Amino acid sequence: LVKWEAGDPEVRALWAMMNNWVYAGFDETYRKMGVGFDKIYYESDTYLEGKEKVMEGLEKGFFYRKEDNSVWADLTAEGLDHKLLLRGDGTSVYMTQDIGTAKLRFQDYPINKMIYVVGNEQNYHFQVLSILLDKLGFEWGKGLVHFSYGMVELPEGKMKSREGTVVDADDLMEAMIETAKETSAELGKLDGLTQEEADNIARIVGLGALKYFILKVDARKNMTFNPKESIDFNGNTGPFIQYTYARVQSVL
């Protein structure tokens, strides 16, 4: 990280190559889900803004420096603890980057409230970010809103990367499409259709089942995603709603 922030050519080249792989994967996954963004902020473009604001806060006495040269915020008056903002070697942390990103977002889109949609394991992080932004003079700091959501688990239990029980989003979507195709075929809903039509219906039903099963649960709660249950053409499921809509359209 020290070499990266110092602009080391070799480290930056390796970083750029790896990032391109990651971004290409993100783009493909979002494309399959039908998701798009008006603007994307990269931490690599915002961390300097964050470091600048942290140093301003240090000069104004909002923050303090430890003997190891690291910079911290004392939030005990707010009922919290001490928060690291810059490491002793001068490199940034997530909070530094989020401060910089928030500043740029405000500059690009003058607002009075900023909304973050991030998992509930980051509740504390955004509580701290709101306080820090307010201390740094951003009037909308206290208006920061964190719309948290729970984690998605499988019937077999919680997904854990170290145990290899994590399901890739692309693999899950493909599995849902295949399950939708099999279920639709068993029920005779693909009879008389071309292969292209059948594949398109399976994609619409499969992804609809996945999205609806997740959306029907209170976003703040953890949930267990059951692929077989979600693809059912009866009950409170995406396929049932889609099927009902199609039937109503045929009547109209």
Which sequence ranges carry the predicted segments?
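NTP-dependent nucleotidyl-transfer catalytic core
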Residues: 1-252
